[in-house]
Amino acid sequence: MSRIALYPGSFDPVTNGHLDVVRHAVALCDKLVVAIGIHPGKKPLFTTEERLAMVERVFGPVAKAAGCDFGCTTYDNLTVTAAEKVGATLMIRGLRDGSDLDYEMQIAGMNETMAPAIHTVFLPASVGVRPITATLVRQIAAMGGDVSAFVPAEVASALKSKFAAGSPA
């Protein structure tokens, strides 16, 4: 039986912090499925299709190099429902600091009640990526700042193009 892990998030955009989590997660499972949450009330900077393409291009080679199968999907329901749908028994969550832990522990407890067969695995962020958040990356990019230290090169390029084209600031 293969061990399938789900790594959920908005990935708007993919950051080096997300990449750090994936690098660690692929060592824990036979297949990693990255699930992009679609929330009707939120207006993402990147379209669903753009985020799926980013996830595939950035994370896919990392999984392949580790000998881990890889997939990406979207979901618009409960995260545990998305995990069950792909057959995941592990849910991967990255932690930057104590406030992340407090929040994620609450969610993990609720998820465990709803889906006891799915276990949350917390992966602490490596020191160099702890301060990175997608929100801060978007803000820096919107103001014309250099985000190349915080995101993969192709994501930095996509952000530059988004804001140069007069897209949402």
Curated annotation (Swiss-Prot):
It catalyses: (R)-4'-phosphopantetheine + ATP + H(+) = 3'-dephospho-CoA + diphosphate. The record marks 18 as: Transition state stabilizer. Gene3D superfamilies: HUPs. InterPro entries: Cyt_trans-like, PPAT, Rossmann-like_a/b/a_fold. One of its GO terms (biological process) is coenzyme A biosynthetic process. It is an enzyme of class 2 (transferase). Keywords: ATP-binding, Coenzyme A biosynthesis, Cytoplasm, Magnesium, Nucleotide-binding, Nucleotidyltransferase, Transferase. Its cofactor is Mg(2+). Homohexamer. Reversibly transfers an adenylyl group from ATP to 4'-phosphopantetheine, yielding dephospho-CoA (dPCoA) and pyrophosphate. Belongs to the bacterial CoaD family. This is Phosphopantetheine adenylyltransferase. It comes from Rhodopseudomonas palustris (strain ATCC BAA-98 / CGA009). The gene is coaD.
